[in-house]
């Protein structure tokens, strides 16, 4: 059998050389291509569709200046250009990268000597792990250092949760968000029919509401609109293909000096008109152009009739409630959370801060029991997937320690004769790459099940994906791989001595860290390098795009629409790295060093991409961040339970009791944090809103608004009574603000803050790195940091946004007839197509042309392009 330590070393060397070579190649190509391929590497600086306030200035051309430039950006700069969601993800990477560096400084000087000296004689990296400790009294070093490191991790979680809540409240109170329609609109779901059909009840519950919009059954309309949209896309694609072929055929005839057609129509240069079948294989074959043109015209009439007969449609169990201001909305929302008045109606959920484009309209008509049933089905399917996905992942774990199996599994004997370098590739590179590929297949299916399970918004789908994908990662990438790696490394000894299986598994568990060293090398070198190079985007831009982008719309979309990160997929990958780092921080502390390097490089790659490359998706207001922070507790639990198990097997009862005590402390902190912070994520204290917009003398509450929100909610009946006797909203505002007086008195009068109007330039702000550590040192400012967060927000957050009337209705009700965009060709076919469809379908050839090579080009936006407007 090959020596396990040499295999471990060769696996590490192979992984390091391979991933470092990939990293250097990717970074070298990125630095060479970046100056001339700005559409790939700095699109946000140059595309016209990017809002002015979100266009960063070009990055430095110097490779060395680039790193310093990105790292020195201030928090305000990151919020403005990376967006709130991007800013919090960068903060997440920085927080745990800094924690890794701190862990190296604290744990390495103590644990590495404790593990390495006078041990049991392990070799390779195993000499630095828990498994090499011979004197069991040394385990107390592991216990107290786990208290120190895990305790500081819990403090960081508390600090960041508190910071997020303050940031969220400050952001919602800013002029920008305070005036958005989404900040004054509530979605109430699963209303009983008695309330749904009696608007008087809704008016009694929400007398300060300005508008009620009931959701109606629009399935028939939505089906017709989708069919019309699909036909419009098919019509546009067919006409573009026909015109492109005709122009190319014309150019060939001219080049060969052959006669040109005497008449101009669709078949002048193409032998047969395009056709398609109405059903796959067995459907009737129809002329594509005629069918699409005539059917779209017929559907226009049907859709228009259905859109104008909205009142005839049946009401379903959801209603949108519009309020005059965010203050009114938050008062009603806090009453929904805390007032007994609402409990007797058994409403479903109340959602605030959602824009019309965020809503999954097809799920608004689900009853409570239907939604629960569908969600149960989704959760069951995913649970079974986690179980059965373990088999291929277990194979990967076995491969990483295949050298231990050779002695008993005879058909693997040939591996023993492989060169060390090849064996290193098999045990080091292959498993980590295979595991990454396996896990990349999961997120799309989770999102599908999230939508099927009744998610109400795209943000909820992302949150659902974040939860389940993280569960997949922990179970498959960590637990299954760790257990199979540990079991594989001990399999020969277990076969010889079955009674000692638990002891052997415990002693071999730290050895599984060798696989995760390779995994961190992959995630920390190849992944950041690939993220910066963006090889897929580069290929699409330079090669594949020229082949597949055969319409003006596709070309315009390629160059003017930014791809956006899916936070429900991105966060779990790095939450897993945090989990692995925490779990092995005491057992095999050397892994923290690799984790630190990985987080630093990932931090730089994502900082650059979020500033210069990636766009913004649906505004989640950073909600994925606290979810990821709570998931860190999973790593803490696993680490502490694992240590307890190792201490029990070593029969060191003192260490066992001490670690069990800290486990209880961790559970208590977790429960307290959920109790303290979860109710504050969506609700905003009235005093926070008024302190910014209406009553600057009112201060932000010291307890983040917990007591104030409960007071407002419980006093809601009195507020309603006061409102019903008043002629306007002034008295209501006075009443609601009075509920925060007790909180106001608790505020430290000497709290140092900054006026949001003093922001002159984001470039004069201190860098994110300096700001982060100065905040960590100044704990008092963090505890009363509402004014400071207001100062961090970009200047355009101070300006109340003026938006046109935003309607909370299904997109099908606002759908307009398709606008077909075709290129203006020198033959006149586009003019012929426009005349052929006149009165039936709107066809445009504006802002398009053909170049001298016969390739179509766009010169402006599509005819139906409309600038994105915040809602």
UniProtKB/Swiss-Prot annotation:
Residues 727-746 are annotated as: Disordered. It is a multi-pass membrane protein. The chain crosses the membrane at residues 11-31, 92-112, 139-159, 380-400, 422-442, 475-495, 520-540, 562-582, 586-606, 629-649, 653-673. Residues 727-740 have a biased composition (Polar residues). Belongs to the CSC1 (TC 1.A.17) family. One of its GO terms (cellular component) is Golgi membrane. This is Uncharacterized membrane protein C24H6.13. It comes from the Eukaryota. The modification Phosphoserine is found at residues 725-727, 729, 737, 761. GO terms for molecular function: calcium-activated cation channel activity. It is found in: Golgi apparatus membrane. The keyword Calcium applies. Keywords: Calcium, Golgi apparatus, Ion channel, Ion transport, Membrane, Phosphoprotein, Transmembrane, Transmembrane helix, Transport. Acts as an osmosensitive calcium-permeable cation channel. Its main location: Golgi.
